[in-house]
Amino acid sequence: MADSPVDSSPAPETSNGTPPSNGTSPSNESSPPTPPSSPPPSSISAPPPDISASFSPPPAPPTQETSPPTSPSSSPPVVANPSPQTPENPSPPAPEGSTPVTPPAPPQTPSNQSPERPTPPSPGANDDRNRTNGGNNNRDGSTPSPPSSGNRTSGDGGSPSPPRSISPPQNSGDSDSSSGNHPQANIGLIIGVLVGAGLLLLLAVCICICCNRKKKKKSPQVNHMHYYNNNPYGGAPSGNGGYYKGTPQDHVVNMAGQGGGNWGPQQPVSGPHSDASNLTGRTAIPSPQAATLGHNQSTFTYDELSIATEGFAQSNLLGQGGFGYVHKGVLPSGKEVAVKSLKLGSGQGEREFQAEVDIISRVHHRHLVSLVGYCISGGQRLLVYEFIPNNTLEFHLHGKGRPVLDWPTRVKIALGSARGLAYLHEDCHPRIIHRDIKAANILLDFSFETKVADFGLAKLSQDNYTHVSTRVMGTFGYLAPEYASSGKLSDKSDVFSFGVMLLELITGRPPLDLTGEMEDSLVDWARPLCLKAAQDGDYNQLADPRLELNYSHQEMVQMASCAAAAIRHSARRRPKMSQIVRALEGDMSMDDLSEGTRPGQSTYLSPGSVSSEYDASSYTADMKKFKKLALENKEYQSSEYGGTSEYGLNPSASSSEEMNRGSMKRNPQL
């Protein structure tokens, strides 16, 4: 009796414990009674063994068939409970150790605690669903998944494990990808915003730079004094005296001794003659900018220029004139410049200085001297220009002991000068009249490329209007007839002066001989010879004897024809500078240049050419008066062109202020 109950007691224990452990056959026997019997206990007892059996038994086919009936029977109360367990079980297998924790739970309380344990996992499952975006879990095992998973595990241990192990990584991968896409999209958005902001910032910086440049271009116009006042070659009277009028230091030393050995190195700046107007070398920065109108000059302090010129040392003196001095200087960058100091009390106002600096800053051409900068320090006003190292045409053509310029070099100089003047007359808007064209204002580099200098006093002429100057601008011998008679200047006045310079290149003679060796001016002497040469084609008598007939006949014809047309008395009959350029280049016939007049009917000799503006006899008389006036002027004789000058030829003198010292009053015709 006692044994029977003992045997009966283990029987149910084994019934509870063995069916889950055995797995396949007992589960098949127990599965049919479960539907008729109470669904809650059977459903509860079934899932725990399924979980434990998921790892041990491989067989699955019979269980898979039984799984569908279990799902409907347990669907109302159980689907929610086992479904969370099954997701817990697949999710823990991925981390590795959650599965061993689940098996002990069913043996502890198969009936009572089974409903309690499913409830806690449900929030965990919900958390897992929320964490893994839940959609994938529902897709893999929604309503059928919990029972099928349990049945599949019981019947097939190997097959369900891969999907379980795969499903969490898939879910995690999907969640990672979905969660990773958002940061990537955000990063791309941030990068795009940063790039756009950078571009906007760069655009703003560019706009600011452009605005600053425009402001700087306008600022140089605020400069004060007159720009080009000294004519170191003695042409100072012209007010814009040549910039470079005695370049080599040997030549400069001689000039210094001649002009006045008492000049101290600082006197040019401090004394009344202190401003040696300088066409100084342009610094590298302004020179390219000078190529365009509205160029920005560099500003210098007086101390900087004093250091550059070694205290305006006499050894650095390039030239002198009635309006000041030109000194050679070296900037800290190593660039050589010519510093022109303007003489105080020269009659130039700040507004005039501002206007002239603005004019020069707008002009840039390969055959024009460029402005580098300027300095205004108290009463001192200095201009800085590019330094042209090989002196002037006057120096090479008329200087004592200088080698003879060969013919190709003379043609090259004539053509370069013509191009520079044509640019001033026709390519600048408004056009610029030089008003002081002469050999002393033609600078040369070592390859004898031409740079036209000293056009700082040039006035802007508007359209076809001419202006009357109160000063005599230009050097004696270069003055146009209409200026001597009426004081009017135009671009055709520059053409006349250029014609005189062409005659210098052809003949090797100065425009006006103050030594008395040549009675007439160069123009009066050359006119009949030009007419004769045009008629018989023989230019030997007109050509410079130092050339020894080594010249091109065709080029001589072109140059002589241009000179003859340029020195016509009637300004209206003179060609434009652009026409002269074309003629010198050989692109225009001489008939076109002479406007159809035959050599025997040249306008400068024919009766009709004795225009109402001026006639040849009056011009000759006035030139003689100019010559007499120059000889009477002591200041002029003490200049570099005086009898003791290095040149010794007194080739150029000029200007108004010398003539306005009472001599003009004695000669009212002037």
From Swiss-Prot:
Residues that bear Phosphothreonine: T301, T470, T475
Primary enzyme class: transferase
Localization (cell): Cell membrane
UniProt-annotated stretches for the region Disordered: 1-181, 589-613, 635-670
Predominant cellular place of this UniProt entry's protein: membrane
Cytoplasmic side: 208-670
Gene Ontology cellular component terms for the protein in this record: plasma membrane
Species this chain originates from: Arabidopsis thaliana
Domain Protein kinase: 312-590
Family to which the UniProt record says this protein belongs: Belongs to the protein kinase superfamily. Ser/Thr protein kinase family.
Binding locations of ATP: L318, G319, Q320, G321, G322, F323, G324, Y325, V326, K340
Name this polypeptide is given: Proline-rich receptor-like protein kinase PERK5
Phosphoprotein keyword on record: yes
Transmembrane segments: 187-207
Modified residue annotations for Phosphoserine: S469
Modified residue annotations for Phosphotyrosine: Y385, Y483
InterPro entries listed in its UniProt record: Kinase-like_dom_sf, PERK1-13-like, Prot_kinase_dom, Protein_kinase_ATP_BS, Ser-Thr/Tyr_kinase_cat_dom, Ser/Thr_kinase_AS
One GO biological process term: protein autophosphorylation
Record key words, sorted: ATP-binding, Cell membrane, Glycoprotein, Kinase, Membrane, Nucleotide-binding, Phosphoprotein, Serine/threonine-protein kinase, Transferase, Transmembrane, Transmembrane helix
Entry's EC annotation: 2.7.11.1
Entry comment describing in which tissues the protein is expressed: Mostly expressed in flower buds.
Reactions the enzyme catalyzes: L-seryl-[protein] + ATP = O-phospho-L-seryl-[protein] + ADP + H(+); L-threonyl-[protein] + ATP = O-phospho-L-threonyl-[protein] + ADP + H(+)
